[in-house]
Design a protein with these regions (language model features):
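N-terminal disorder-to-order initiation segments that are Gly/Lys/Arg-biased
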Residues: 2-56
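A generic structural signal for solvent-exposed, polar alpha-helical segments
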Residues: 11, 36, 42, 65, ...
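Catalytic phosphate/metal-binding cores of nucleic-acid and nucleotide-processing enzymes, i.e., regions
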Residues: 12, 35-37, 68, 98-103
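Short, conserved turn/kink motifs that form compact alpha/beta structural patches or helix kinks used as
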Residues: 44-95
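Short, compact, well-ordered microdomains
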Residues: 83-115
């Protein structure tokens, strides 16, 4: 399970590296409950993080906890409606040319999607 402390630590490291490192943009694609895949969010992450941490961040940042997920500062909303469901098992994350699917509780387990 993704720890909130780790997310806060990653965010603080990101702030420290922001001036010297360019950010990487990853995409969250909802396809678990839709007729066709839809990119719902772009998320800026530190490129030095592992794919695993980037995926954990993508899952946490696209789930509503205390506030709607699209209001997170790291998230660029890509859906046309006023609201959008939270990410779920079966949804995907695109990191460069690598696509992963959330396939466990709270995104803790990931699977590489074949091209």
């Amino acid at each position: 399970m993704f720890n909130t402390y780790i997310l806060e630590l990653v965010n603080s490291l990101h702030i420290m590296n922001k001036k010297t490192e360019s950010l990487e943009t990853i995409a969250v694609i909802h396809c678990a409950h839709e007729d066709f895949p839809r990119t719902v969010a772009l998320i800026e992450v530190d490129p030095l993080l592992t794919d695993r941490i980037k995926i954990e961040m993508a899952y946490e940042l696209t789930n509503s906890h205390d506030v709607e997920w699209w209001k997170n500062k790291e998230v660029t909303k890509m859906f046309p409606n006023k609201t959008c469901r939270s990410s779920d098992v079966g949804d995907q994350v695109l990191i460069e040319d690598r696509k992963y699917a959330f396939n466990g509780e709270r995104g803790a387990t990931i699977a590489r999607v074949d091209r």
